[in-house]
Regions:
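Intrinsically disordered, metal-sensing/regulatory segments
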Residues: 1-250
Length: 250
């Protein structure tokens, strides 16, 4: 099995694992959730820089292309954030009879926001695989996203069930999110492999998208419940974990 297939299937499996855990763990304490997300944010931060942006600069003398790609990746995620509130209507779920339709609408917005971010996250993993040369940083993007997938998938299960969505449909939603991320992996891999000119741009784009997710979503979330110190040290530990892995191999 090729590395890109391992990456794609691994990301999908971690979403399903998180969803299954969500059926048994109804509510993960904020302290643990913030600590885990902080650790993941540290890995994602290091992976964005070492696994995507630095290789992008090394791949071309046209540094401005990389800068443009980074800003475009962040802007793309920003646009997704702006349009997310309008996309839940396409699911049709809000038209059905549930225990609490008002609650369901808010839950669907949350689920849709997670789902939409899985496409560019998958693309980032795919682009990093297209530049793979055996270094731990080649896998760091996929590992960071995979670790993030588990708690994210866990937290969408309980709200969906409480809003009246059936268990079968909840599992189907989780599976669909996993397929969306797999699609992103292959899109990113294809674009990154298309040409030497496209590779640094796509690496920068993926790096910008991951930095946006880390700064705009993951870090603020870990600081929202009073456990910012634990989350900060967890972030530092995650960042250093990747640096140590890179140093140990190289």
């Amino acid at each position: 099995m090729t590395p890109v297939w391992i990456s794609a299937l691994g990301l999908c499996v971690t979403i399903l694992v998180g969803a299954i855990l969500g059926f048994f763990i109804k509510e993960l304490p904020h302290k643990w959730n913030d600590t885990v997300l902080g650790y993941c944010a540290g890995i994602m931060l290091a992976a964005s820089i070492l696994g995507l942006i630095v290789p992008a600069f090394n791949a071309t003398a046209a540094w401005w292309l990389v800068v443009l790609g980074v800003m475009a990746g962040a802007a793309f995620l920003n646009v997704l954030d702006l349009i997310t509130p309008h996309l839940h209507h396409i699911t049709g779920l809000e038209q059905e009879e549930h225990l609490n339709n008002k609650t369901l609408n808010h839950v669907l917005l949350f689920v849709m926001a997670i789902a939409l971010h899985k496409l560019p996250e998958g693309m980032a993993a795919g682009v990093s695989m297209s530049n793979s040369c055996g270094s731990p940083t080649d896998w760091s993007v996929s590992v960071g996203i995979a670790l993030q997938n588990v708690p994210e998938a866990m937290v969408i299960i309980a709200p969906l069930l409480l809003a009246g969505v059936s268990k079968l449909r909840t599992v189907c939603i989780s599976f669909a999110i996993g397929l969306l991320e797999i699609t992103g992996v292959w899109i990113g891999y294809g674009l990154g492999s298309a040409s030497d000119t496209m590779l640094p741009v796509m690496l920068g784009f993926a790096g910008g998208a991951m930095l946006y997710v880390t700064s705009d979503e993951m870090i603020p979330e870990t600081h929202a419940h009073g456990y910012q110190k634990q989350a900060t040290y967890a972030l530092l530990l995650g960042f250093m974990t990747l640096l140590v892995m890179e140093k140990a191999v190289c």
